[in-house]
Regions:
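Soluble catalytic domains of membrane acyltransferases
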Residues: 1, 9-168, 173, 180-182
Length: 182
């Protein structure tokens, strides 16, 4: 058992991380209601001996913290910028490397939002990489990364199916998470 797995165990967290070790993969992670989600995600991925990059708002990438986040796989994102340029950049990045796993929070914020971002799905359509569904459930202290979502190309149907998957999970701050109406 490595140090990350031990830390999770000491704090009473369980982990079910059973997805195959794909050379390239997106891990869609929800609910995202606290900065602790990042720490738990890092512990989870490292406890199974893997690495994952992650998207994070650019305001976190100030010196010296920015050096740390970039060293562990952080990709700064300028919030509010629309138009697909991030998706295009990530597609080029994925196409230029042999291996890359990227964790993405579709809510794009820790605040309560009904409309999730769809860039990760557009990215999956363009690259053909698998989309793993990762969930952090605070009441049960359980992290689940065991489902692979097969995108159909219908962005609305795909997003509805993904949101439905997360219905049974509760974030650290439950009032900050919703998948929308039933």
């Amino acid at each position: 058992m490595n140090i990350s797995a031990r830390i999770l165990k000491i704090f009473g967290w369980t982990l079910n991380f059973t997805i195959p070790d794909y050379p390239k993969c997106i891990i869609c992670v929800a609910p995202h209601t606290s900065n602790w989600d990042f720490i738990l995600g890092e512990l989870a991925i490292h406890s199974v001996g893997r690495k994952a990059g992650f998207l994070m708002k650019s305001s976190w990438f100030f010196f010296p913290l920015g050096l740390f986040f970039k060293a562990i796989g952080g990709v700064p994102v300028k919030r509010g910028k629309k138009g697909g340029s991030l998706v295009e950049t990530l597609v080029r990045k994925f196409n230029s490397v042999a291996t890359l796993t990227l964790a993405i929070t579709p809510e794009g914020t820790r605040k309560r939002v009904v409309n999730w971002h769809t860039g990760f799905l557009r990215f999956a359509y363009e690259t053909g990489v698998p989309v793993a569904l990762g969930a952090i459930d605070y009441p049960s202290r359980h992290i689940e990364v065991s489902e692979i979502f097969e995108p159909t190309g219908d962005i609305n149907a795909d997003l509805a199916a993904i949101k439905n998957y997360y219905r049974g999970y509760t974030g650290k701050y439950p009032d900050k998470f919703t998948v929308g109406p039933s």
